Every structure is written in structure tokens, then in C-alpha cells.
Amino acid sequence: MKSKISVLLSFLCLVIFMPVLVNANQNPGSDENGPQKLENPMSVQYLKSQLLKSQPRMVLNSTIEKSLLGKLKSDPVVQNLYKAIQLSAEKIQKKPLLVRKLEGRRLLGVSREMLLRVNMLGMVYRIEKSPKILNRINEEVVAVCNFQDWNPSHYLDVAEMSMAVALALDWTAGKLPKSTIELAKTSLIEKGIKPSYNEKGNTGWIKGTNNWNQVCNGGMIAASIAIAEKDPELAAKTISRSLNGMPYALQEYAPDGVYPEGSTYWGYGTSFSVVTSAILESAFGTDFGIAEYPAFKKSAMFRVLMNTPSTWYYNYADCGDKRSEGGDVTLAWFATKTGNKPFLKRTVFFSRIWTLANFPEFRVLPWFGFRNTRKKQVKQFPEPGRVMDQTRS
């Protein structure tokens, strides 16, 4: 089944991203038997000393929230997007709670819906601290944590559900009932993390070279941070394993940023890598080299050049045919990291509220980090068609 653009994090909307880039002199080097490594100092001692103690600490933290609130007062695009989030949250509250219903062998649709719901409800809760929203988040978490499992035979399902539950815990910052917090942490351990240590199970993604690596390792990192105080040994071991495993997928961007699975899967896999980068930066003050990994930033231009004037893709492999009209939120993150503001299409995100709230891809919302973009001269992008013609000549 072809994966759709990731149902990720609405917290990407509105966030003033505070990058803490890895020192250029701290080159972790390459393993002659594998890809260039990320920095990996992770241990129980490192986890206990370096992990931010207060919540939220995943993508959002107190510093980022302060900047976010400032944007909500001053930026009309951010204001427009937040209204769309509010509308989505209202619609979610009218829906029934999720049930464990497989489609074929997959639970992925349920996991993605849970991730969407946590993003929308969680962002509204962070801004408004509404008891009604908090109660609905509690109900959503209890419902999915009472599933018999999260379908580990198809680990994407586990990964996206784990990220959803981890964010629900983090963004409610201890305000859920103690029984729910304990249930959620136990579920993250037993249904999320531990099945990934089953050698007979579906664990090839750990050092895989496609989007499964990016999605599943990202989900395990989020889950590990959420349960760090409950089981620091398991958390540190799992984060360390993911930091060792992720380069096997990140190396696929080399040498020029071209993604082997095409533009559609670039959107899915890359969106999880940028979310993972953001989670690590907000929680530890560093992403251990993800954003600076060779050719990773170059891939943003690949994404741009795969877009045709007709709104279709120059596609290959099992890439889809047509891109979303809802804006490219992953490219918006690259705008904050590279200074290339054209990667962030503000006019697209200033669409009608109803349109934004009903786009499936609105589940992942843009990063607004203009204050943090480095000042640099931005090259004009050639038209994709002309580039392709020039390439042939």
C-alpha cells in the first residue's frame, strides 16, 4: 500500500523554531562498514543529566511556546492557521473515540487518526488550557491504550501510535489523571517499545534504508522520552539504538538530496526526520546531527524541482502523481534551517480557514521561524520544466 504524506504534528504550525546546530568541528565521522554516524552520547547518565525536566519538551518547550504566543498576536498567517486548528479540534470532539479496526493487516489508518487528533487537540490545549479539551485528550489516550496491541506486525502502525500517545502525555504536562499517565507510559513500554526488541518480529526498519526507518525510529524516540523517568535504562538504550540506526536512511539523500523513493515518500519519510530533529532539540538541546547530515538540506531543492507547473510531480519509483494543494509544510521547516524563505509559501497557508481545516495534509502544519532564518542571498529557483530540459541537453 502506498503511504500517504505523513499524518504528523500540528505543533509544527506556529512554532518559532530555535535551532541548536551541531558544531561543525564535531564530526562524528564515518564507519568504514556503514554510513556516517550521528553523534551518540546517549546513556542512562546522559539521559538523566541532559533531558529537559519540565514539560512540554517535545518540539514545544517554554521558550518556543513564548515565541509561539508572540506570533499568535502579531502574524496574520499564524492566526489564520490557529483558527483552522480550532475548527479541526471542534470537529474531532464530535467524532466517536477510536477503535482497534484493522484494514487488511494494517492499523495505520487508526494510528494516523490518533496522531491527527492529538496534534489538533494538543495545540489548542497548549494555547487555551481548556478543561474540555484536556478531558477529550484523556478519553482518546485511554481508548487507544486499552487496545490489545498496536499491531506490531506492521510497525509503522506502532510508531505513529507511539508518537501520538507520547505527545499527548508531553503536551498535557502532567495534567491528565494519574491513572491515565500510568496507563499511557505502560502502554508505550509494552505496546510501543518492547515489541521492537523482538528479534523474530518486524524490526528490519531499525537499520533499513527507506521511510520505515525514519518513521519507526522517530516514534521510538518520542516514546522513549515520554517514559524516560519511568524506565531510564530502556529509554536510553532505545534512543541510542535509533541514533545508530537513522543514518542508514539519512545516507540515501546523498550525494545531492535526491530521494530514491520519489517526491511523495520524500514528504512522508522526511517529515518524520524533521519532527525527530525537533523533538531531540527541544528535549536535549541538540538533534545529534540530523539536520546537518550530508545532503539532507539539499533534498529540499529536490522537492521543489519535482513539482511541475500543472501541480503534478515528476515522479518515479512508487511516487504518487499529484501533490497537495494545501502547502508543503516540510519545506517550511527547511526554510527555518537554510534561510531560503521561498521554501515557505505564506500565501498558501493564508487560505480560507475551512479549506485548511479540511485538507488531509493539514495534519502537518508549517514551521514559522522567520526570526531564526539566517540572512543570506536566496537564489531564484528555475522553473522545473526548464531544469529538466537543461538536464537532458
Where are the language model's segments positioned?
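Extreme N-terminal leader/anchor segments
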Residues: N25-K83
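Short hydrophobic/aromatic segments of transmembrane alpha-helices and their interfaces
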Residues: S6, L47-Q50, L115-R117
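Bacterial N-terminal signal peptides
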Residues: L9-P19
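Aromatic-lined, polymer-binding surfaces characteristic
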Residues: R57-K73, V78-W312, C319-G320
